[in-house]
Amino acid sequence: MITAIVNFKLPAEIDAKKATDLFKSSAPKYRAMKGLVRKYYLFDDHNRIGGGVYLWKSRADADAVYTPQWKAYIAERYGAPPDIRYFETPVVVDNESDKILADAA
C-alpha cells in the first residue's frame, strides 16, 4: 500500500467552514475510485494549509489520479498547486474494523 500526503497553501478567505464546504463537495468523486482505500481531508488554519491523506492499494493507482489535469484542478480550486509526498505503507492498524492490514512488500 501507498500513503500519499497532499498539501497546498490556502488563501486567507478560505476559513474552516469554506474548506469543509469545498471538501464535502469534492468527496463524492473519490467514492469507488479505483485503488483508493481511504481519504482524509486536512485543514490547518494557523499555517493556512489544506490537503488530504490518501491510502492507495498501489503507487500505480495513485499515479493514475495525480495527473497534470488533477494538479491543475487543485491549483484552480484552492489557489495553489499541490505538493505530493508518497510513503510505502506496509502495515495499517484499523481499530474500526479490528484488523491489522499488512502489505506483502
Roles of regions detected by a PLM:
Residues 72-76:
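A common structural junction motif
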Residues 1-50, 59-68, 78-105:
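Short S/T/G/P-rich N-terminal loop/turn motif that feeds into the first structured element of a domain
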